[in-house]
Amino acid sequence: MPHTSPETEAQRDSNAPLVVVLLGPTASGKTALALELAERFDLEIINVDSRQLYQEMSVGTAKPSPEQQARIRHHLLDLRPPDQPITLQEFQEEALQAVNQSLAKRGAAFLVGGSGLYLKALTAGLRPPAVAPQPALRRQLAQLGQPLCHQLLNTADPEAAVRIASADALRTQRALEVLYATGAPMSRQTSASPPPWRVLELGLNPLDLRQRISARTQALYSQGLVEETRQLRERYGPELPLLQTIGYGEALQVLAGDLSRPAAIAHTTRRTQQFAKRQRTWFRRQHQPHWLPDDNPLNEAGRLIEAGLG
């Protein structure tokens, strides 16, 4: 059965401010559609992609280009260097500020991204435990290696382990950090206080997603993913957790001579397709978007937003 959330008072109140969410798996076309919608409704885009929060990571995260950012103002891009982790709580604080500014300025706010937990935390008002980063513990966990860390998390907090990809070192370390700092699993410490918004969720899930992912991966390598990875490795070292994520991990192996470029492209494509499958499962269980048609998502999204704005 799909997960459903109880309707909040704000959701029922047609006078509550409108927050539009465009969600979908990686390579589903969110960026292009978001730009069209933002221009049509005079909105600014608030990023909800966890890797795009970091500086110096543009190619591998498919961050909106400088030209696209010049068309529409974007928030929550390039917040910090990649060696300074951003917690879920810190993301919420930054995102809430951007949402409130947009509501005051435009009368509506526009969230775009595929990081399901970040979207859920913001729109449902989840309150994760306030635990400061523990650099010494993170270094120890990095030395243990991501496979063992994820196994430890699966034993101690299986609910969190199901939500966190086995290769996601940053979120695995954060969940273990909370566990060791507080003595209780993160999944049992999160409360909810829904914000006073009406949330309109629009979803993209194209039938040709596998082909889109394959084309996206080829484009990342042709646009300079390996060189971007080289620069990150030189500045921050090969153990940087974000360099273990999809795309960067394979490019790192190319630089080390452990993978050929064609093999890296194939491996990145496969991992991305697996990740997209997990994203779609999350969206089905944790969100209730209006799924947009493949043939004309812009018209349907525009109609729904116009109705929401009244």
UniProtKB/Swiss-Prot annotation:
Keywords linked to the UniProt accession? ATP-binding, Magnesium, Nucleotide-binding, Transferase, tRNA processing
User: Where, by residue number, does ATP bind?
Assistant: 24-31
One Pfam match: IPPT
Query: Positions of the site: Interaction with substrate tRNA?
Result: 115
Q: Where does substrate bind?
A: 26-31
InterPro entries for the chain:
Dimethylallyltransferase (IPR039657), IPT (IPR018022), P-loop_NTPase (IPR027417)
Cofactor or coenzyme needed: Mg(2+)
Q: Which residues form a coiled coil?
A: none
- GO terms for molecular function, please? ATP binding; tRNA dimethylallyltransferase activity
Catalysed reaction equations from the record: adenosine(37) in tRNA + dimethylallyl diphosphate = N(6)-dimethylallyladenosine(37) in tRNA + diphosphate
> Which superkingdom, per the lineage?
Bacteria
Summarize subunit and interaction data from the UniProt record for this chain.
Answer: Monomer.
Indicate the family of this protein: Belongs to the IPP transferase family.
Task of the protein: Catalyzes the transfer of a dimethylallyl group onto the adenine at position 37 in tRNAs that read codons beginning with uridine, leading to the formation of N6-(dimethylallyl)adenosine (i(6)A).
Q: Which PANTHER family match?
A: TRNA DIMETHYLALLYLTRANSFERASE
Protein name stated in the entry: tRNA dimethylallyltransferase
